[in-house]
Amino acid sequence: MFTRPLGRTSWQVSEIGYGMWGLAGWSGSDDTESLDSLHRSIALGCNFFDTAWGYGKGHSESILGRVVREHADKTLYVATKIPPKNFKWPSRKGFTLDECFPPEHIREYAEKSLENLGLPHIDLLQFHVWEDDWASDERWQRAMADLKEQGIVRAVGISVNRWEPDNVLKTLKTGLIDVVQVIFNIFDQAPRDRLFPLCEELNIGVIARVPFDEGTLTGTLTKESTWPSTDWRSTYFVPENLESSVDHAEALRPLIPSGMTMPELALRWILADSRVSTIIPGMRKRRNVEANTAVSDGKALDLGLLQQLKAHRWDRTPTAWSQ
């Protein structure tokens, strides 16, 4: 496993990190399987783990904390997120800081997450939604600074709303954000326009999430795919989105090099951008852990292929189903 610097932090994080939403928010979640996959990922060199209080109301955090404590001899980095006070994902323009992240709420959930994790500190604490209109509000700034000074939190980050990579630029310019997490994949290339150049200028770490476009870039979805009503994907892949997503994936298929899978192509495409610090695919099953971590081998995609993949950019705007 290769590592990359996480922005201005002193941390060298694994190119393939571990996204933990699926361990508590999707159908088929199984703690025994999740624990096995987490332990396997560590054995294969993964050292960066991204969770949130919102993933099972702290359940995902508890699973992660247990695993980290069992590997006390290793340097593992834990990232989690504060839910918005109104519990609405994503935030909307017009939402106020008081509705989402008043200072007392920031502290309350930092302490809840710390308790769930059972660790001495949180390496990276992120806001789970964000509106750039809050950039200059000193209340969140002081709240996070206090948590840092008290040793509860080591670094501060923002998880940018889906398909809104520019809705954080003013906040990054405050100099108070160490890491940004954003959707970035073969379809979602917009972060390259303005976000990545700014992150590079300010030495801000970049976490690439949703590398497989919620499953589209695994190449396994069909227009007949369905999910249980309890599975978040059942509300995301409405017919309008599912049909278009499958069409985009099928258009990509002829470009996949011989001997390579679509998920491997998706990960290698992201790694081709040196401004990305780590990718956090969801990995519930051991076989997916092994396949995804194997991509961190230093082998680059052909430049001609990278050029062709630019044409598969798919710009989308938030809708009622894209929470």
What are the language-model segments listed below?
Residues 6, 18, 34, 41, ...:
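Conserved, mostly hydrophobic/aromatic
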Residues 86-100:
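Surface-exposed, active-site-proximal loop segments in enzymatic domains
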Residues 74-87:
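A short, structured active-site edge motif that brings together acidic residues
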Residues 57, 129-323:
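Beta/alpha (TIM)-barrel catalytic core signal, keyed to glycine-rich beta->alpha loops juxtaposed to Asp/Glu
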Residues 114-133:
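Active-site groove signature of glycoside hydrolases
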Residues 29-41, 100-117, 162-171:
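Short, acidic/polar
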Residues 1-76:
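N-terminal binding-site loop/beta-alpha segment at the start of enzyme catalytic domains
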